[in-house]
Amino acid sequence: MTAFSPTLGELRNVVDAELTDFLAGRRAALPEAGELIVEIQRLLEAGGKRLRPAFCYWGYRAAGKPHSAAIVRSAASLELLHTFAIVHDDIMDQSSTRRGVPTSFALGGVSFALLVGDLALVFADDAIMASDFPPPALAGAFAAYSRMRQEVIAGQFLDVKMAGDPLVTEEEARRVAVLKSGRYSIQEPLAIGAALAGAPSALEDGLAGYGEPLGEAFQLRDDLLGIFGDSSRTGKPIDSDIREGKRHVLYAKTVASLSGGERDDFTRLWGAGADLGAEDIVHLRELTECSGARAATEGLLKALTATAYERLRGLPLDGDARGALEALTRESTDRQS
């Protein structure tokens, strides 16, 4: 048993080393898919915060369990799942860059990117099932893992479905945020870690109660960065969400706050893609700001974050787990990328 208690940076390094070893083994076993595996490795090396592995890891440690190679392997599997999700998301959005590098879609087209994403998903399944936990623990964790996969796909579908609705409501947008990112990014990773640890149901419920508002706050921060962030830090153009016509909470709040010609302009231009000029982007961003939608979204984000902190304080955790989850809460909501 070891007392190793990694910082977020140290944990990322450990997870990345595990991913590199895992992919090297898969490349040796399946050389025919070598190009696809190299592409998965390229995407992982491009960056990413590794928040999903971190929440899984600390969901496990929250139950009083020590650091182990098995939990690192399980946590790392969630980064492979995330790779699947973002590669397919880039296809649907026809995105050219992510994390400051070309997307798989931009490099090889739809067929190549589909196969990269599909293989990442298969590898994610392999990694979590090969993590050396007892079968009962794996069964409980895989139930949460299965929910995670289903929810991100359902959320993505709703996101695509709403793209043609200029009058999407805030309630609808929040539902998509919870499914597409909130539960998938935080709540389910915590549940997977807790299940692997055999955590009591009271702790599992407490972690879920903490993760739910935090997950939604995480997505709201992502939406704000997509419009008002610094592209040199986010790794993607800050006009991409506007050109693609993202129907997120920020959009819904703006539409609800505008009226008359301003509202007509906003709904007509938002999502107009390559037809938008630089002045149109500035105009749309200004409408989002002057309508009060940006401030209202920030206010909702802060309220959700406060709820998450309050629920975290009520959990019976040791100092290491509490400190790590507090740091992850800040990382999820105060980030600039």
Q: Locations of the language-model features?
A:
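Mg2+-dependent prenyl diphosphate-binding active-site environment of isoprenoid biosynthetic enzymes
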Residues: 28-263, 333
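Short, charged, amphipathic alpha-helical segments
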Residues: 9, 139, 143, 208, ...
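Short, amphipathic C-terminal "tail helix"
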Residues: 304, 310, 316-337
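N-terminal amphipathic/basic leader segments beginning at the initiator methionine
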Residues: 1-27
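Hydrophobic core segments within long, regular secondary-structure runs in both alpha-
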Residues: 12-16, 89, 142, 146, ...
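Non-transmembrane, amphipathic alpha-helical segments
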Residues: 3-7, 43, 173-178, 202, ...
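Mobile late-domain/C-terminal helix-loop "cap" segments
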Residues: 264-313
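Hydrophobic alpha-helical core bundles mediating ligand binding, dimerization, or RNAP-core interactions
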Residues: 15, 23, 40, 120-121, ...
